[in-house]
């Protein structure tokens, strides 16, 4: 990811909140939607009966022609720019009794477009969900002597990356000296 990583994270969080019809900064939202931990073995384990949604954004490992779709333009700055669309995957893991309903709701509502709706929230941050993601997978995960419900959802994304060509050339501060010979 580029320097806009926190902007991307905020946009994804807000889009997920919009899918579920929750205000982004409420206590209920903060306890329900969480970014995945980088070290899962050290992450806190919520109660088996609690609904929790973890998400993470990672680059796709396979070479996808869409990830190399580059267009050259100058965005009114008179500097050449390359606009690339990099392939990423949004992995959403839902736990708890309502995990399947949450996963289906996110999959269905992520593509709604309009003011304050998920697709527009993502588009403002340069994130474009690829239509028709696969259906969520319902799994059961062992937790002690009991089973915990889990639904996995993977959504392919394209993230816009703008590269502006800028070469610093030494500025001419005074005209060059001209020597005339007779």
Task: Report each predicted region and the residues it spans.
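Mixed-charge, glycine-accented linear interaction segment located at domain edges/termini
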Residues: 156, 160-182
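Short beta-strand/turn micro-motifs at beta-sheet edges
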Residues: 75-81, 142-143
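Short acidic, gly/pro-rich beta-turn/loop elements at beta-sheet edges
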Residues: 65-67, 100-102, 163-167
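Acidic-leaning, charged glycine-interspersed low-complexity segments
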Residues: 101, 111-162
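Soluble non-cytosolic domains of exported or imported proteins
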Residues: 3-7, 96-101
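Small/polar-rich, solvent-exposed N-terminal microdomains that initiate assembly or binding
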Residues: 1-76, 177-182
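Short amphipathic alpha-helices in soluble, non-transmembrane regions
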Residues: 104-111, 170-171
């Amino acid at each position: 990811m580029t320097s806009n990583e926190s902007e991307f994270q905020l946009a994804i969080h807000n889009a997920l909140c919009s899918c579920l019809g929750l205000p982004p900064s409420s206590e209920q939202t903060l306890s329900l939607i969480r970014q995945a931990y980088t070290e899962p073995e050290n992450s806190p384990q919520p109660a088996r009966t609690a609904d929790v949604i973890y998400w993470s954004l990672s680059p796709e490992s396979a070479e996808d022609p869409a990830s190399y779709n580059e267009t050259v333009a100058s965005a009114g700055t008179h500097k050449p720019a390359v606009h690339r669309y990099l392939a990423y995957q949004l992995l959403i893991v839902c736990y708890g009794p309502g995990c399947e309903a949450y996963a289906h709701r996110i999959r269905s509502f992520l593509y709604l477009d309009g003011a304050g709706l998920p697709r527009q929230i993502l588009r403002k941050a340069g994130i474009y969900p690829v239509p028709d993601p696969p259906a969520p997978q319902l799994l059961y995960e062992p937790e002690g002597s009991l089973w915990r419900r889990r639904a996995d959802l993977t959504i392919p994304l394209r993230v816009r990356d703008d590269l502006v060509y800028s070469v610093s050339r030494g500025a001419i501060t005074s005209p060059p000296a001209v020597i005339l010979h007779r």
